[in-house]
């Protein structure tokens, strides 16, 4: 018996039930991935490298995605996730265009107290900053070299059907794709998630992030700085050369006015928050903005269906972990799908999908709770809260073991509970 299914997506029709998946298909694969962004593309590379056949459907034109002005964002890649990217052959394709994060300073407004994570304590980089555009390029290059991978882009899915034996997607050009499992990697407004009737919980913060790249007079020396201001965090993230990526969080009602400011007035607002520790500073390229919310799917799996990345969980960037937790999903799901393929097992088996959800959902929910608490704690200037917060920062700075625990968690190398997935330990599948 078939599941409730998604039809007429382009026309905005509600999901409707269909009959069994029948007939021939233009493309046949083990796994269909809807969404070829950073998380979906990485999953495709991890699977195809080991001979699991994948078809990736993405609605964006690859050429547009690689344009310097597409979205302006960068990602902080934790050390464990860098190991994943390296193990599946993506890291070398960046051509050295990444910036090691050697130090992290957390500052609470104008307080003299701060938290400093030093390279010496981490015994190496804590992570890396990478332009999303360059990571997309690496993914596209890698997919093009893997015979088991097929990318259909730009392509729009108009129907998704699931039955006892598999899934079938129909595209706007009439092509059909048949697979044994569909993975929704299609972001916060996931069509795959909606097709399964999986609900979401959303929390708003009344905050919007302004994202831009700046160049500055002095070297950042690989140091990432996060200032917690009353309106939200102001993060200065090191990029190659004398450049940094800014994630400037403001009240949403103020952002349109800031974005509309003439260059010299915007520069003044920027300098007021940035400070002079890197000498002069000036914007390079356009300004972008993104509304900040928390979003959590009520479940991650359904019949022959799994969700990864933002389709399953979307978090505030206060801790810089959104991309990393999507890659954790990739590591866990890829390990199980590759193992199933080697044993001749069904990649859409309920037990496999249940194990994926059991391993990932609690971890993601914990990080969602942590980021939510951080936003509410550090965006609160009520005197007793501010005092407790500053004392807490000072105390953690003086407590070496606790500070190192927080540092290892941010790096993705903290070992609590089950052993981390193979890819995050740098072990091939």
UniProtKB/Swiss-Prot annotation:
Pfam families: FAD_binding_3. SUPFAM superfamilies: FAD/NAD(P)-binding domain. Its EC number is 1.14.13.-, 1.14.13.240. Keywords: FAD, Flavoprotein, Monooxygenase, Oxidoreductase, Ubiquinone biosynthesis. It comes from the Bacteria. One of its GO terms (biological process) is ubiquinone biosynthetic process. It catalyses: a 2-(all-trans-polyprenyl)phenol + NADPH + O2 + H(+) = a 3-(all-trans-polyprenyl)benzene-1,2-diol + NADP(+) + H2O. Belongs to the UbiH/COQ6 family. This is Ubiquinone hydroxylase UbiL. The gene is ubiL.
């Amino acid at each position: 018996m078939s599941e409730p299914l998604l039809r007429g997506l382009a026309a905005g029709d509600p999901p409707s039930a269909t009959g069994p998946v029948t007939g021939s298909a233009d493309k046949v694969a083990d796994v269909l991935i809807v969404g070829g962004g950073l998380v979906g593309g990485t999953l495709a590379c991890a699977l195809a490298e080991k001979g699991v056949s994948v078809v990736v459907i993405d609605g964006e034109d690859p050429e547009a995605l690689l344009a310097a002005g597409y979205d302006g964002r960068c990602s902080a890649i934790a050390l464990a996730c860098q190991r994943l990217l390296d193990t599946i052959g993506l890291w070398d394709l960046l051509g050295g265009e990444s910036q090691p994060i050697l130090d992290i300073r957390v500052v609470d407004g104008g307080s003299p107290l701060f938290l400093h994570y030093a390279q010496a304590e981490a015994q190496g980089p804590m992570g890396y900053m990478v332009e999303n555009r360059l990571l997309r390029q690496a993914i596209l290059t890698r997919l093009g070299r893997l015979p088991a991978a097929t990318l259909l882009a730009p392509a729009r899915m108009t129907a998704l059907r699931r039955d006892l034996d598999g899934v079938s997607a129909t595209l706007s050009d009439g092509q059909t794709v048949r697979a044994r499992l569909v993975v929704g990697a299609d972001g916060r407004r996931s069509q795959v998630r909606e097709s399964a009737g999986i609900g979401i919980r959303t929390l708003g913060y009344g905050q919007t992030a302004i994202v831009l790249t700046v160049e500055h007079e002095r070297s950042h020396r690989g140091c990432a700085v996060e200032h917690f201001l009353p309106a939200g965090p102001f993060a200065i993230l090191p990029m190659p050369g004398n450049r940094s990526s800014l994630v400037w969080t403001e009240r949403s009602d103020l952002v349109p006015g800031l974005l509309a400011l003439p260059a010299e007035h915007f520069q003044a607002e920027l300098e007021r928050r940035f400070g002079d520790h890197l000498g002069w500073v000036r914007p390079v390229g356009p300004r972008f903005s993104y509304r900040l919310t928390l979003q959590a799917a009520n479940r991650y799996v359904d019949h022959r269906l799994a969700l990864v990345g933002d389709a399953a969980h979307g978090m505030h960037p206060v801790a810089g972990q959104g991309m990393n937790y999507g890659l954790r999903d990739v590591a866990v799901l890829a390990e199980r799908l590759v193992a199933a393929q080697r044993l001749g097992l069904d990649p859409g088996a309920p037990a496999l999908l249940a194990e994926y959800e059991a391993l990932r959902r609690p971890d993601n929910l914990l990080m969602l709770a942590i980021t939510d608490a951080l936003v509410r704690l550090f965006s609160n200037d009520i005197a007793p809260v501010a005092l407790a917060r500053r004392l807490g920062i000072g105390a953690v700075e003086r407590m070496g073991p606790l500070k190192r625990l927080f540092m290892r968690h941010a790096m993705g190398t903290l070992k609590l509970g089950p052993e981390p997935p193979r890819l995050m330990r740098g072990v091939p599948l």
